[in-house]
Amino acid sequence: MPDYKSTLNLPDTPFPMRGDLAKREPGWVKSWQEKKRYEAIRAAAAGRPKFILHDGPPYANGDIHIGHAVNKILKDIIVKAKTLSGFDAPYVPGWDCHGLPIELQVEKTHGKDIPPAKFRELCRAYAAEQIERQKADFIRLGVLGDWSNPYRTMDFQFEADTLRVLGQIQQAGFLYQGAKPVHWCVDCGSALAEAEVEYEDKNSPAIDVGFAVADRADLARRFDVAAIDTPVQIVIWTTTPWTLPANQAVALHPDFPYTLVRTARGLLVLAESLREAALVRYGLADGAEILAHTTGQMLEGLPLWHPFQDRQVPVIVGEHVTADAGTGAVHTAPGHGLDDYVVGSRYGLKVDNPVGDDGRFYASVPLVGGMSIWQANPLIVETLEASGALLAHEKLLHSYPHCWRHKTPIIFRATRQWFIGMDSAGQDSGVRDQGATLREQAMKAVEATQFFPHWGRARLEAMIRNRPDWCVSRQRNWGVPMPFFTHRETGALHPRTTELLEIVAQRVETAGIEAWFALDPAELLGDDAAHYDKTGHTLDVWFDSGVTHACVLKRRSELAHPADLYLEGSDQHRGWFQSSLLTGCATDGRAPYDALLTHGFVVDGKGHKMSKSKGNVIAPQKVMDQYGADILRLWVATTDYSGELSISDEILKRVVEGYRRIRNTLKFLLANLSDFDPREHAMSVDEWLEIDRYALAMTRRLQGELQRHYDAYEFHFIVQKLQSFCSEDLGGFYLDILKDRLYTSAGDSRARRAAQNALHHLTHALVRWMAPILSFTGEEVWTQLADADDSVFLHTRHVLPEQGGEDELLERWARIRALRAEVQKELETVRVAGAIGSSLQAEVTLHATPSTAALLSSLADDLRFVLITSQARVVGADADRVEVAPSAAKKCDRCWHYRDDVDAHPEHPGLCGRCVSNLFGDGEARRHA
């Protein structure tokens, strides 16, 4: 019997079935670097419309974690998608280099007794070393960017431009110095930014303290009662006993009703809505007698005695007082709370801060001098109890601000700091709304910004609406200095501040921040140096990263301002998004971005936060070593990043399965294009078979959908549709039907070349769709389609041929596919029963209604190819029904169809008539499939 296998057009490609991504990807990374792929992309994209995704700088400390990987992969997908969509989309990565974490690492290695200049030198070296480590991992992820020329906030030019932005903000009138309560970390020894504070549960002493009324006759008049000869106390409730030494007043709500109550402990004044709960707490509810009511406003100015210091404090009123808990009376210490500070300012209260940088009371403070605030708490409680001022004492578990670095409780303490005023109107600069405050400008800028997902707008608006002034000064060594000279007596800035800032900035451009630290004030001030102090403050690192729009976007010629997109984790609503917004509005009157995209945090497969203690941390390096970066990239794209991103070994295994389906499709496509040259074998769409035109219509429709999803950053929909297209539209339908034509038709026949034309366009479209996500696999596919020096990223979206009547074609074949699905169900039933093996062993009779019969009959003999059966007949009927029977015909040794004409040609034993025609005659005629 002849062997006809050699007469078939069998698939042939060096593209391997197994990806072996972990082994192969490093070779692609090396190739990209050797061939300067990023630079080549920039050259190819020159002159196109710009799309600028501005990189928020990760902190230069420690190995990258899975959250870093998510962030960089999302950015890379967008940049590559925009490049393929016809944009010039440069990507300049950056790093945040100053600040406390680096200081702590240097101290851990070298100790604390290091001269400041040497210490900063070590910090700079450490940051540079960390950047190189992180950079290698980011590159390994397949992220293309200007890695040889990133921006670093410690670069001299960047540091100098940071000072210039500070100067602009100072000139605009938004910067001021003041003693205000700020978040203070005792362990850091520095003020903290809002973004450096996180809330955790803490047990605190909750105490009710009575402030004795100093003028009982005055109180009687205000309550409109007869003379009072019994001691009276207004009772406050607090969870910070240590702040009582700094108390300057007791605040009531002006509109709340307050009650004068007679108890076994004397007369008490309590908010009416909280009276009952308070008396129960004190054990004084039994026998309590209500004497009178009045409003908080009527008690304003009433003098009270401090509970353990020999001084009087007034009653004040404020809208910040609530009736949620406590007594309706608030102990007010302007040096230890922002609300207290604000209301105290209206009354001219003293801003007293008896606590030092280390969290200890100054030695001169009565009772608690020299003690830490936490040690002072029990002593103050004991003192209050001994004096009869303590009415209740209990432990309260509540949410309390903690330092994000040390995980320790922080305090509010008033210090001399530099602030950017949220409610300052600033001076008209020609770019801002005249008379608008920074808060108003920021709110307007948020309104003009596009958000992905949309709920980010409300979140950022709420933060801007409620945030306090921005404390931008820090007491650190490794940071960009605030190069101001302040008058020793008045505290005023030197009148030449603008000029001096630029002189210092020019020096910093040459020598870095050391130029300021080493500066002798007399060099710049001359005789004035005797009257001015050189400030020792450094800038908040959020200011550093918040001015990248000026130091990077405006500075680098390949970029543009404003950026089209900022993309970071959802925590950056209170971090980089906000600091960039405020500095942008202060200098340019607008946000430095047109759109914001936020992604969620990574959690384990059970939705739990990752932590080393739980042992559920998944490192991106491990995933790349085990599965390859493309699997990590596919996982990121598969997940809806607007919420939490779940990852586990089980989830990754499912991603691998999805990848294999895509890879199998790619292998089939490439294997059947091995002898196809578009320059030689191209055909007009009119010459294609109908099912090929249908495949083109599906591809064109999907390309439009995917482009819309890419534009909306909806990557999980892209992956869903890509996998569905590969599995259902291609593998489960078109390619399955196509195998017979590709393998058995004459190699250069119209039928086969038409199929290859369709596959050529489909492959070129598919590889471009997937390349932003599966970048290494995309490049691997591209080597089979183009020269070795070429890259998929040097091209734009594939231009698919146009054709008329696509809507009708799609509708017609949707009906055919639905009918085919019914046939497949019946074939499977017969196969499971053991009557047939493959569907080619079956002969199908379709009993069809007139409309169905007309549709199926229009395919003529090609219907059997669509159904992948050896024979298909259509007969009229009142209802659609499928009948399947095993074929009694012989099996063709070449095409495996069961046909009555097998062995009809004695000179070609074992062949059916169409195989004889395809091999030795004019070839079979196909029109539809």
From Swiss-Prot:
Binding site for L-isoleucyl-5'-AMP: E568
Annotated cofactor note: Binds 1 zinc ion per subunit.
Any one Gene Ontology molecular-function term assigned to this protein's record: isoleucine-tRNA ligase activity
UniProt: Zn(2+) binding residues: C892, C895, C912, C915
Locations listed in the record: Cytoplasm
Motif ('HIGH' region): 58-68
Binding-site positions, ATP: K612
Transmembrane segments: none
EC class (word): ligase
EC number: 6.1.1.5
GO biological process, one term: isoleucyl-tRNA aminoacylation
Motif ('KMSKS' region): 609-613
Cofactor list: Zn(2+)
Reaction it catalyzes: tRNA(Ile) + L-isoleucine + ATP = L-isoleucyl-tRNA(Ile) + AMP + diphosphate
HAMAP family: Ile_tRNA_synth_type1
Cited function: Catalyzes the attachment of isoleucine to tRNA(Ile). As IleRS can inadvertently accommodate and process structurally similar amino acids such as valine, to avoid such errors it has two additional distinct tRNA(Ile)-dependent editing activities. One activity is designated as 'pretransfer' editing and involves the hydrolysis of activated Val-AMP. The other activity is designated 'posttransfer' editing and involves deacylation of mischarged Val-tRNA(Ile).
Subunit structure and binding partners: Monomer.
The protein's name: Isoleucine--tRNA ligase
Gene: ileS
